[in-house]
Regions:
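Core AdoMet radical
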Residues: 1-12, 21-56, 67-72
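Anion (oxyanion) recognition and catalysis
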Residues: 62
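Acidic, glycine-rich loop-and-strand cores that form catalytic or ligand-binding grooves
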Residues: 94-114
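Accessory C-terminal segments flanking Radical SAM cores
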Residues: 110-200
Length: 200
């Protein structure tokens, strides 16, 4: 997950991304935070000029054949259909090869409210929902962050929970190869249920 702005645009980071993409062709996908496809709404969340900087980073990724996905937000009052059409036009304008209709490539997150009650995830849920635990992102993905002032990077289980200590899995990808307990409200709301109900 990246905003594709200054940290990603450092020459050393760009060189590292290019090496990774060359070593593992077709296996690297960067999810870019684009709160909204309209400059005024994105910049209202991220600061003046933010979308322009993100687009510059995305163009670099495009030109270096690094696959992209987008994490957007659905808190601006538009329908899912209208949001996806807007992102589609944004992608077309910049020649970004991202499918706006694929919820895995254009993820639209609702507002995250930890106070909203959600059902507990049980083993029965997987059968009721006809889903597999392997389908949730934390079963196969990790996020590496370097916190300000920290001596080493941290490997997190989930992009939605960057500040929850129980989802910090260590300081290396090897340390982070472990099962993740789905015990946060966001696990149920966003990843497992995704709007479905755990009652048969």
């Amino acid at each position: 997950l990246t905003n594709a702005m200054r940290p990603m645009m450092r020459k050393s980071v760009q060189a590292g991304l290019a090496r990774l993409n060359e070593a593992y062709p077709g296996k690297l996908t960067l999810r870019i935070s684009v709160d909204h496809y309209r400059t005024d709404l994105h910049d209202a969340e991220r600061g003046a000029g933010a979308l322009e900087k993100t687009v510059t980073g995305m163009k670099w990724l495009r030109d270096n054949n690094i696959r992209m996905a987008v994490a957007g937000r659905s808190v601006f009052g538009a329908t899912d259909e209208d949001s996806r059409a807007g992102y589609g036009a944004f992608y077309a304008e910049h020649s970004f090869d991202i499918d706006p209709q694929d919820p895995g490539m254009t993820v639209l997150f609702p507002e995250m409210d930890e106070t909203v009650e959600v059902p507990e995830i049980t083993t029965a849920c997987w059968g009721i929902l006809d889903k597999s635990p392997d389908a949730v992102m934390c079963s196969s993905s990790r996020m590496v962050v370097k916190r300000k002032g920290a001596a080493t990077p941290a490997v997190l289980a989930c992009t939605l929970l960057p500040y929850s200590e129980e989802f910090e899995l260590g300081h290396s990808l090897e340390e982070a190869e472990k099962d993740v307990a789905l015990n946060h409200p966001h696990c149920a709301k966003f990843c497992v249920l995704g709007g479905a109900s755990c009652s048969a």
